[in-house]
Amino acid sequence: MSPQRTLPRPLSLCLCLCLCLAAALGSAQSGSCRDKKNCKVVFSQQELRKRLTPLQYHVTQEKGTESAFEGEYTHHKDPGIYKCVVCGTPLFKSETKFDSGSGWPSFHDVISSEAITFTDDFSYGMHRVETSCSQCGAHLGHIFDDGPRPTGKRYCINSAALSFTPADSSGAAEGESGVASPAQADKAEL
């Protein structure tokens, strides 16, 4: 038998403590813009605590998760645009929302591929892909590859990370998204 090589016990403990400290410091940062220079819109924690509900702050800034089936938009079916609750960036159209049975609002596509940032998330001993607002870094939820066609994606988003702008008869919600409908495009060409 060959001798087994192990680290000296004090060195093992020190290494373990350093890894735990690094993990704790990494998870304590607000939002998903690790370096605020990467965020296009930056808010102070003080301002966010005043403006957001405790649940909205916990979800968007501390990467929390609201209870399943209890979010404001879980069963919401009105036409309109879902936006980031922190900065107002348009994220999802109501036409892409579907009932996944997961207990959280689910969408199969985003308004713009630039609206959301993806980050590997290894919390809770598993690998997932976190979704964050690319403008302000707010944690939104996660994306999975078990959604419906045409994308096969399921953006599983916390209601607390969203605000909603209803569509009205003039299509104002569509116009706010920066994405014109085909009917609006035709009118512009006339």
From Swiss-Prot:
Complex formation: Monomer.
Positions of short motif Endoplasmic reticulum retention signal: 187-190
Record InterPro entries: Met_Sox_Rdtase_MsrB, Met_Sox_Rdtase_MsrB_dom, Mss4-like_sf
Role: Catalyzes the reduction of free and protein-bound methionine sulfoxide to methionine.
Note on cofactor: Binds 1 zinc ion per subunit.
Keyword check for Zinc: yes
PANTHER family reported for this sequence: METHIONINE SULFOXIDE REDUCTASE, METHIONINE-R-SULFOXIDE REDUCTASE B3
Binding sites annotated in the UniProt record for Zn(2+): 84, 87, 133, 136
NCBIfam families named in the record: peptide-methionine (R)-S-oxide reductase MsrB
Cofactor(s) needed by this chain: Zn(2+)
Organism whose genome encodes this protein: Pongo abelii
Renumbered residue ranges of the record's region Disordered: 166-190
This protein's UniProt keywords: Acetylation, Endoplasmic reticulum, Metal-binding, Mitochondrion, Oxidoreductase, Phosphoprotein, Signal, Zinc
GO CC annotations, alphabetized: endoplasmic reticulum; mitochondrion
Catalysed reaction equations from the record: L-methionyl-[protein] + [thioredoxin]-disulfide + H2O = L-methionyl-(R)-S-oxide-[protein] + [thioredoxin]-dithiol; [thioredoxin]-disulfide + L-methionine + H2O = L-methionine (R)-S-oxide + [thioredoxin]-dithiol
Occurrences of domain MsrB (ranges): 45-167
Name of the molecule in the record: Methionine-R-sulfoxide reductase B3
Gene3D superfamilies: Peptide methionine sulfoxide reductase
Uppermost EC category: oxidoreductase
PROSITE patterns: MSRB
